[in-house]
Amino acid sequence: RNLCRIVSASFMEDSYYRRPRIDRDLLEQYHEGLICCSACLGGELPQKIMEGMSAMGGENGNINSENTFQAAEETIEWYKNLFGEDYYIEIQRHQTTKPGADQHVYQVQREVNPVLVELAKKHGVRVVATNDVHFVEEEHAEAHDHLVCVSTNHFIDDENRMHYTKQEWLKSPQEMEEIFSDIPEALENTQEIVDKVEVYDIDSGPIMPKFPIPEEFGTEESCRQTFTEQDL
């Protein structure tokens, strides 16, 4: 229920160029019963880490600078205080050799992931292995690449257009185990999240509006007999 409230509010209250978004105030209001993960490289926590790395480069590579990842640590503590044991730090590995795929993402993941793991241990937050999903099967990567071109108004042969890693399919447990074989606890924590999720059925049947039948039409059955299927 709280998730539905957040999603609805994200579209209505403060959308950005018709893109849904929320702020921390809304999370504080509707966080009960939700599980929160730190997201991909575009998430708040990885972005703070990358900002720290950039500043670190400006400090002549002083990796031991006390404030290098202060903003990232403050971010972790905020979410941990709000969600408790339902807050997880994500790591992803989108290594790719596919032609035309983005190679840079994995390079950044290799730099950011060790920091994520280190900060997770420092703050007592569990790490979870995840994979961005934009299409279902591996062979759908090329179709997705074409759709990205359509949505961004670029040609396939445009070198400066948006590229994905072509690793964003719904990977099997076996594929994820191979990718994260060196961090088995991250895979175990994925199952932990699954066990936490409440099982429920989604009613996929049509939900029709209720139209009151005027008294002069009698019952619903008599109303139905008055008109043919074509009339209706």
Task: State the predicted function of each range.
Residues R1-L232:
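Phosphodiester-processing cores and adjacent nucleic acid-binding clamps
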